Amino acid sequence: MEEESISGLEVRFYQTQCLSEDNVIKFENNGYPMIDLILFSDAYQIQRNTSIPIETVTLIQRNLQRLFSSVPINGYQHYLDVKEFKTHYSSGIKLLDQLLGGNGFTSGEIYELVGNTSCGKTQISMCCSLNLSQQYNSNIIYIDSSNSFSPPRLIEIFKSNYLIKQRQKQQQKQQQKQHQKQQENNDKIEQDKILKILDRIKVFNCFDSITLLELLSTIDSTLSIISDEIPTFENQFYKGLKMVVIDSIGTLLAPIIGGKQTQGHYTMMMISRLIKYIADTYQIIFLITNNTVGGNSFDNKAALGEAWSMVPNHQLMINHQYNDDENEERSIYIEKSTRLPVSIIFIINLYWLF
């Protein structure tokens, strides 16, 4: 028996929270098994044939159009929009900001940290999340695929990078006795700051690609409501959202791609398109970590293949090696970028002070 050919445009491949299993069955049983049939058919005709509410049909068509449509824009107008709406955010790491053009992260762009296991991708992600929360009072969504997010480690980085500097300034201005009297009050202030920083970072545990797709869809739908100026109490967090961290994309997508897993490849493409759409439409920074695989020349390269390599605007490679039995040296450089020079290397220390 010949294997049935798959085009990747079957409705079932694009099942989401809106396009539920029940709706998929109704589409398939009433002559709409393919995406193009849904997009090019009249919404009221679909409603009559499938008995799906017209509001749901319209919403499904709109979401599918976001994935498959390409609207041309004027180049000069695009330049003006970019110049007006782009915002820069420091990563909290001075040399990393210099590596990224001198201004740190740029809103609406996708950054990918690539490296072997235990090379420091999660540490940099937490450090950048910490700085955006502490310096800009921004909200961050941290999507964790391996329970790597560690609040105690975040507090340790906070104390090392910020509180030590503040105490040094206080010691220069105050006498030792006055500093000892105020130590208890300072500890309380420090604890309040840490709690506020942690409160602005929302962590989601995610262990498969479908959950990731649903999370991104929720972010998109919530931000679209806010952009229409209809905020609710639950959406206040998203109003101040500036960064989404995905740690790690390789863990989520690697099991579903490769070989004859056609559906997995299209799921990856759906996720990549949604990430690009959210980043560009709502000017959200995406910081994504990825694993490495062996290249042809015994050099490591980013996992997930060439199709995924076109997703990030900037790809940063992290290397680490042992100089002797005790010392481990890590370095980071830009492997690929749409606008930044590559191959500039600098060293990382224990507390990510470059």
Curated annotation (Swiss-Prot):
Binding site for ATP: 115-122
Cellular compartment(s): Nucleus
Domain of life: Eukaryota
BP GO annotations: DNA repair; DNA strand invasion; double-strand break repair via homologous recombination; reciprocal meiotic recombination; telomere maintenance
Disulphide bridges, residue numbers: none
Record-level GO cellular component terms: microtubule organizing center; nucleus; Rad51B-Rad51C-Rad51D-XRCC2 complex; replication fork
Pfam families (UniProt xref): Rad51 (PF08423)
Coiled coil: none
A GO term, aspect molecular function: ATP-dependent DNA damage sensor activity
Gene3D superfamilies the record matches: P-loop containing nucleotide triphosphate hydrolases
CDD domains according to UniProt: Rad51D
UniProt keyword annotations, A-Z: ATP-binding, DNA damage, DNA recombination, DNA repair, DNA-binding, Nucleotide-binding, Nucleus
Family affiliation: Belongs to the RecA family. RAD51 subfamily.
Function (record text): Involved in the homologous recombination repair (HRR) pathway of double-stranded DNA breaks arising during DNA replication or induced by DNA-damaging agents.
The name this protein goes by in its record: Probable DNA repair protein RAD51 homolog 4
Organism whose genome encodes this protein: Dictyostelium discoideum (Social amoeba)
Biological classification of the source: Eukaryota, Amoebozoa, Evosea, Eumycetozoa, Dictyostelia
